[in-house]
Each structure stands twice: as C-alpha cells, then as structure tokens.
C-alpha cells in the first residue's frame, strides 16, 4: 500500500511539474479556428486550436492541430520574430507581419490578430490587404470571420476564430 501511495504521489508531482504557468502580468487568449482555402475546384479545410500569450517583452502564439499536435509556434520580441514548425524548422523575420507574409503570403501580424480578439473596431486593422473581417458578439461568445484572396497561392481564404480570454 505504501508503494502505491508513493507511486501516486510521484505521478501527481510529475503531472504538476509539467503544467506551464502563465506569469501574473501576461494576457492569455485561447480558442479554436478553422481555415478553408479554395483554389479552382479544390477546397482545403483545416482546424485547430491556438494559445496566445502577451507579455511586456514578447508575444507567443502556439498553433495546434485538431488533436493537439503542434503545427507552429511563433515568438515575437521587439527585435525579431521566430517561427518553429512541426518539423522543428526555424524561420526568422524582423516582425510577425513579415514572417507570416514569408510563410503564407499575407502580412498578418500578431498585433492585428490581438486587435481582432479584443474586438477593437479600428477599420484599418479589420479590413486590410484584401481581408474583410467581421465579428459578432453573441452573449459574450465572440466569433471572428476573415475572408480574402491570397495572390501567392491564387486562392480564396476564409478564417474563422472562436476566441476566449483566460482570467
């Protein structure tokens, strides 16, 4: 019985030590997303979850697939932005807008995504680079929809984000 208690304590200790704590001064957003890309007659659909941590010195955006597998992690500081994909390949740029443009052909920054999540009504942030963005707040549940044409892939893209701010 004593061995079982020790084993249970050890497992509990390991599980607790694996959780990532968010600092007090961090702003934390989590949620789900779906992306549909139409090119010609083919349609690609993807979905997953995200976690955005905003700290005074950096922003971290983790993007996961539908079953929690890592798709990419983006970390932006004042001087540089780094993306690490699921194959652990690293891509760097001067900021998140340049990085996302380099990867998928849309200059979309973490700051612009954060403005969408906060439901800020700045027309320049919401509708730029051929993205038409709308949001609706139904009983505290925000739904963001961005639609636009991506020249680099010659496709029409629709992005839907269902965010929530963590306490």
Where are these regions (language model features)?
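Bacterial N-terminal signal peptides that target proteins for export
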Residues: 1-8
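C-terminal motif of bacterial Sec signal peptides marking the signal peptidase cleavage site
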Residues: 14-17
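Bacterial signal peptide processing site
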Residues: 19-22
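Short, hydrophobic/aromatic-rich segments at coil-to-beta transitions
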Residues: 26-32, 56-60, 138-146
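Mature, soluble, non-transmembrane domains
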Residues: 94-167
């Amino acid at each position: 019985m004593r061995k079982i208690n020790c084993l249970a304590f050890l497992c509990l200790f390991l599980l607790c030590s694996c959780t990532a704590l968010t600092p007090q001064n961090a702003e934390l957003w989590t949620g789900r997303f779906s992306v549909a890309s139409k090119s010609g007659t083919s349609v690609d659909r993807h979905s997953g979850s995200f976690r955005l941590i905003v700290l005074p010195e950096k922003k971290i955006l983790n993007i996961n697939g539908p079953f929690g597998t890592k798709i990419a992690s983006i970390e932006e500081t004042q001087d540089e932005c780094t993306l690490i994909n699921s194959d652990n390949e690293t891509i760097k740029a001067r900021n998140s807008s340049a990085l996302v443009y380099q990867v998928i052909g849309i200059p979309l920054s973490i700051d612009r995504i954060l403005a969408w999540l906060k439901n800020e009504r700045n027309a320049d942030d919401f509708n730029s680079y051929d993205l038409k963005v709308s949001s609706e707040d139904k009983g505290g549940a925000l739904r963001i929809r961005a639609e636009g044409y991506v020249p680099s892939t010659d496709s029409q893209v629709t992005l839907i984000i269902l965010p929530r701010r963590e306490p």
